[in-house]
């Protein structure tokens, strides 16, 4: 009787999970969902004929992942590999796996990425959120495994940061995520509202999202040209929240944003959505205080109400009212995680900013306001950077690290001033919006 009861309960649980997975796609237009999938394929990674495509997705997002698979084959992909994960299983791994297993990343998994990279694969990552899932899990164990994986996949991540590999990150909602964002709504209403917000923020809610993104990309070009021609020696950020930060820039730095172009000359959009224009600061020339204005989700844990103090580029002090241990673990990942690899300008006039809703997801929240990136700098943010060695990049002032984690600090009253070499100051942003 016990075994039979267990099987019945298991079947009920499985049925409930299936109903949940199916149910969340009944609350969004199927036509719009297909357009969203096509956007990831055609604009996100710009799949080429006979190209290998890897779709990385949690099993909960199987319906949308399959739509991407179909769109990729329609675009001419030679093969579409579904690389499934399961967050519930990942939690069990962190809770119960042996310590020596936590401290290493399997060779066979690293070998897969090398094989895919060598084959010229494009990677599409479908993400979602369940902020409470990893409660009770040791942040130290999670950090150990994440560090091990980044170390083994260092070459892969270097190729993604230099855009030698085309990749795209986009999101779909979950019931757990939706009720966190909209706690006052019913589960179904919350999910429907989050679908609407995600598609709106991703500019995927119109009749022709691909055309909308082509227009969106053109809007970046004039601002990038002005910033790149100006070659400001430093940027000065101030806000009423307490931020007073000087960010020194390396010589011959480049601002990029919107789309990027890989070494073959093929354009793509790594982030859907994207509203940022970003560059790499000089590793040793960041000074002052940065006060975060949005929670940071790192390794499944929440870091909130926190600040960072910089001296000569290095984080010398920090505090988080929530997630202090996680913040410490992040900063102590390696020597490079004490320094910055990215500085990004974002207007508060973007669709996501105007929605004025905290999504508890870095991909979306970083596109609502200015942010920094702790850790590794992209070679693409330096003239001829993709052709420089790691040593040459460091000599030019760029930071190297196993990670890159973005922290949002922009506000509605943020002021950004560009400082030229001779000391001339130029107002770049006022009240959180561009002035050029």
Over which residues does each language-model region extend?
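Dual-mode signal for accessory low-complexity, basic/Gly-rich regions
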Residues: 317-386
